[in-house]
């Protein structure tokens, strides 16, 4: 995309924003501006039964158009903390510039009622970490598409959306530890959520905040969002929280965009498997475990990839992610004859305690055990006792996880 085309597009957007069609709407949006300072907390909170959290490849305004029918919608503008609109006047292409080319947001950001308290404040600080301050603007009008070079939309497709303008840390010029950076993001994210709550937002469009031009690691940013949402129970307040993330994978590149992968890992439902032979797959079970689906067996059975397995199909159908597959070929729920201890039985401490990784617990534990107990004639009372022991240990180790028992009827 040529820079002069982007500059021309932005200039056209400004003419329309301040022209007869939008002058009044732009003025109302300007007057609605409010600067929220650090450590803000909303006083009144309306609770929702359950928040749907979505991670999808999309752009910010396109996601707003898609989900605005579900309730009052606000989007996060990944702001430049010292220059309104970032480099939009010069044809820059980061997220904020795209928003300013498609809407009347820019005149709101340059208005005197927020400039000194937000941009002037950050200019005086001259700090690459920026601050948790933000601007909340109501009813910004989106009238151009969210394409690389926005095009005018038909009038009936125009829509209004609230915009939260907040800057991420700029880490390209910073030396900062991961935990400290996550702490900075946690505080900033909390302020964003509290401002949204204060304005009765029902659908909040977020994204890979600061993971583009500002060079923040997506794993840390995604984790900060996840921890804040869980700790402050924001998943009980909004109807929808949407992470709209533009893919960075171009042309003939393969693999998932790192930003999307990081947010998927945090927010998609995580499954762990506790199973026997049919649940094993070469490369997916702990080192040293007995595996059935490996080598020539994979060729013979046609089970050579995760999408060929029963559990892979279940996880895919439920739009989830595999966390741990703790399956051992030939294992039973009951004690295996000849073994000194319970391991590798399904009721052993090693099996029932090995379904998490890196302090991340599963949302769902899929238990696929019992076939070998039946095949080798395990005593029903012994089986019942072992199964109850297994469930008891799973509940103790993973109190918040759902346990799906797939082989009992």
State where each predicted segment sits.
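Active-site segments of SGNH/GDSL-like serine hydrolases
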Residues: 366-374, 392-409
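Structural beta-sheet core signal
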Residues: 75, 243, 273, 367, ...
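Macrodomain-like recognition of ADP-ribose-binding/processing modules
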Residues: 1-204, 208-267
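Catalytic His-Asp segment of secreted/periplasmic serine-dependent ester chemistry enzymes
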Residues: 270-274, 278-284, 289, 409
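Structural motif
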Residues: 74, 203, 270, 363-366, ...
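Conserved SGNH/GDSL esterase-like catalytic core that processes O-acyl groups on lipids
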Residues: 281-388
